[in-house]
Amino acid sequence: MLGLLRSILILLLLTLVIQSCGSSDTNQNDVDSELPTVSSGNDLNPNSSGNGLFEIKSGTVSFLIHATSATNTKPQFNSLKDPDGNELLTTLGEFAWKSNGYSNLLVPISSSYDPKPGIWSYSATNYSQLKLDMRTSDLSETPTIKVQPYISGSDNISSALNIMKNIFSTSGINLDVEDTETLESKYSQVSYNFNNSTTSEMVSKGDEDKVNLFFIADYTDAVYLGNAAGIPGSQGLKGSHNGVLINLSAHKTGGSLNNQLLGETAGHEMGHFLGLFHPSESAGTLFDPIADTPQCPLSQNSNNDSKLTAEECGQQYGADTVSYTHLTLPTKA
């Protein structure tokens, strides 16, 4: 558990550097044969074909490339090569976040790859904006993450927030949780889809240098406990993919909140937002890229229904971690 949660901080990118805007199809003076120039000051300058170069300087701990587009378009990274010419997407492509309106690449997403100093190259399509964030400072012995909770309605979530804080503190991570802000009633029930206009408007209220948690009364179109805007979310980039949704209704039995489950869900989805995948997916064939997290193989599926449960995996295979593949919805009274 210690290695799992501290990995969050290795991947965390809350230090803004610089933003660049570009388009994959708007510069009419470019030609496809144009050679990309090395980005200066961390400003991405791809050519008309979407190919670009950027420099990672010595001392960089991690970096995150954002690509945004219209909500009905999925921006795509087709290549990311380190200074030695190694193509990271060959082995880590399945962990590159891709969704309509927003995609990203995070390095390191695995201990197999470091943000090596030197000239990196990339290729992207279907984007309207590109942005590069870098972390250049090491973590302190007791790192701190700023968290901003928002809530629709009058439920008291203070106990759940304390449970969430304790989950992180047991691994030496401090959560600086600010006072909960109350949302307007129009955000009481929203879509799970971060491209939905109402959801996007709500999430865009969040600051770019915090993890923004939105506790909503219910989803209009899903029965999830919660969901994050991405793995990772748009850390350092203010907008509609800069937050986590948590469904209060799904955590109630007989009208009462299950604070333990609510705190665990908040910690689970926050882990996704910071870049953590499930250690094992329920099919038992896909595992996260972090070496020190336990894997639960399909051979543990004792009832042969092709879906692993927490009981089948047990503590030995990571079922007791907050990032395990799923949490269980409570039974409604």
State each model region's role.
Residues 8-17:
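Bacterial N-terminal signal peptides
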Residues 16-45:
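Bacterial Sec-dependent N-terminal signal peptides
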Residues 45-90:
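Acidic, Ser/Thr/Pro-rich low-complexity intrinsically disordered segments
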Residues 149, 199-284:
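Active-site-proximal segment of zinc-dependent metalloprotease catalytic domains
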